[in-house]
């Protein structure tokens, strides 16, 4: 459906007298179904949209991360340059799989302000190019996998390309929460945990998150 593909808000119109359901965009435009008759009573139910998570790199961690993100109401999109890796067979839970050039993401995918961007490709050079493009604008979350040594090396190259320290400071790297994760599944859990926390902060206006959980 258009609203889910473009991440635009929409309402579900349900006729109280047995009329057909319709999908109404935020601007009042009919997106799907039959428009309710003027005299018909109906109720509008807002449709929640999960945040879009862009996973750059279709490796083992991504295979563990995508189904996990799906269960916590993210909308995972997997992007890789290798068609044998990025496909619906390997990622049945992904909302979308994209085969594209890491150096020219905009040719295949628009990066949006509310996107959660996870960078863990099969090469440091690809990670660098994706991070460089991601830092050209603000996003909800940018996380990059890698050691402290790799991060320092990449940051030095990014500075050479004009990326400021203020921009570098928004990147979560090494990615994930500090839970001593080792296996791909454990690393996926640590990444998902960090994304949940950032999402909670954003929903609370950037203030410290209060989860109502005895563990926090």
Question: Model segments located where?
Answer:
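Segments forming oxygen-rich coordination pockets for charged ligands
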Residues: 1-81, 85-95, 112-116, 150, ...
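Short amphipathic alpha-helical segments
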Residues: 66-68, 90-91, 110-111, 129-133, ...
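Conserved SAM-binding strand-loop segment of SAM-dependent methyltransferases
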Residues: 95-101
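Short glycine-rich, flexible loops that bind phosphorylated cofactors or substrates
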Residues: 125-127
């Amino acid at each position: 459906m258009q609203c889910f593909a473009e991440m635009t808000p929409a309402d579900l119109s349900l006729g109280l007298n047995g009329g057909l359901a319709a999908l109404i965009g935020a601007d009042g435009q009919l997106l799907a179904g039959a428009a309710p008759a003027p005299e018909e009573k109906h109720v509008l139910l807002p449709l929640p949209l999960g945040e879009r998570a862009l996973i750059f790199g279709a490796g083992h961690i991504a295979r563990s991360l995508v189904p996990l993100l799906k269960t916590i109401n993210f909308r995972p999109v997997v992007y890789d340059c290798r068609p044998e890796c990025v496909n619906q067979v390997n990622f049945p839970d992904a909302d979308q799989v994209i085969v594209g050039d890491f150096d020219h993401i905009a040719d295949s995918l628009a990066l949006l302000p509310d996107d959660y961007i996870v960078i863990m490709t099969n090469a440091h050079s690809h990670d660098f190019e994706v991070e460089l493009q991601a830092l050209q604008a603000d996003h909800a979350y940018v996380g990059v996998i890698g050691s402290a040594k790799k991060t320092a090396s990449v940051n030095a190259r990014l500075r050479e390309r004009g990326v400021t320290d203020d921009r570098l400071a928004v990147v979560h790297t090494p990615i994930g929460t500090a839970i001593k994760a080792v296996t791909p599944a454990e690393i996926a859990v640590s990444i998902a945990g960090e994304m949940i926390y950032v999402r909670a902060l954003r929903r609370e206006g950037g203030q410290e998150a209060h989860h109502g959980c005895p563990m926090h």
